[in-house]
Amino acid sequence: MKPTTSILALLLPAISARFVQETDGDHVQLHPEVAEAEKFHIELAPGETRWVTEEEKWELRRNGQRFFDITSTPELGKTLRSQSRPAAVFPSKLSQQDAVKPLLKKLAKEPMQKHLEKFTSFHTRYYKSEYGRQSSQWLLSEVNKTIADADAHKHGVHVQHFEHSWGQNSVIATIPGKSKSTIVVGAHQDSINLFLPSILAAPGADDDGSGIVTTLEALRVLLTSDELAGGKLENTVEFHWYSAEEGGLLGSQAIFSTYEKQKRDIKAMLQQDMTGFIQRTIDAGKPESVGVIVDYVDPALTEFIKTVIDEYCDIPYVETECGYACSDHASASKAGYPSAFVIESSFDLSDNHIHTTDDKIKFLSFDHMLQHAKMTTAFVYELASTDFKKLENESQGMSEL
């Protein structure tokens, strides 16, 4: 939908009615004071930036334009990008089938449906709203419950808020490994109605409630693994549930900006944004599949994910593109970390109900979400088990031959 006239521009005048009287003898002047709308610095493509009002941000989004809001994170990526770093290396073959396949049998649709019914019951999860704050609090408590049910706190597994100034906090769960090298899985918790974000309902069942419950189910099952939950695997694992993705990847930028400054060793980041809608694929006469994004991602990590899908999922993948800054993986990429993104289908056949009051559970397939949960579970376990130092040394040795 591409309306030519902005609804908010008609409803919300930008002029203040305040006047100031100045007196100099018999001389009186009345000066209308114009209230300047707050401006935000956005990046629409690499190096292409502009200053816009918040309403102009939503107008761009209504017209299908994605962007980083870099107002608070102008330096993101400058540290790591300035360093000479070897290309990321990932296993050419999978090795954890004996551990992973029993875990996949534990994944279930019922917990995902229960969680999504609750998550979509908030009027909106708009990141500046009280509902957005409440939904983040609920998510934190639910992740804490998941950890407690697995008795994983005793191994140092924990969850905490990553606080933001706008009210809705991001949520990060950590499963310690033998090293500080970290595998990240992400999804975004906020929803938005692009016509009146502060007022209209935004159930956000698919965008990105589906990604939230998919990753939450993967976490539940992974914590049943004594090897992973007990910290016996090579690498640390983090699950991220980002705030304010819809506002320009604000939450994920804040997190990866912090990680960059801390010189965190993030080996891989996988984003799960929209995992449940298949109807347009079926209507087009095409087979059910997952969409592997191939633009603005790490090529080696993306190839690795294809092997994971081939080995552990029951449906194939299709290659597809989503453009610049299309979801939170872009923040990891900009910070210099290898990232990838898998969506529910070919991008052109993805959910057309998003960002409206109609993004509802009734349009989604929990069987399809289960395929994303399988991929996520396998991705985490395989990479958590990978000795990256050994892999990188072997790769360097081969390149010197």
UniProtKB/Swiss-Prot annotation:
Signal sequence, renumbered to the chain: 1-17
Chain positions carrying an annotated carbohydrate: 144, 393
Group of enzyme by EC: hydrolase
GO biological process: proteolysis
Requisite cofactors: Zn(2+)
Subcellular location: Secreted
Propeptide intervals in chain numbering: 18-87
Gene3D superfamilies, sorted: Zn peptidases
Top-level taxon of origin: Eukaryota
Cofactor detail note: Binds 2 Zn(2+) ions per subunit.
Keyword flag Acetylation: no
Assembly and interaction partners: Monomer.
Job of this protein: Extracellular aminopeptidase that allows assimilation of proteinaceous substrates.
Name the UniProt record assigns to this protein: Leucine aminopeptidase 1
Provenance organism: Pyricularia oryzae (strain 70-15 / ATCC MYA-4617 / FGSC 8958) (Rice blast fungus)
Lineage: Eukaryota, Fungi, Dikarya, Ascomycota, Pezizomycotina
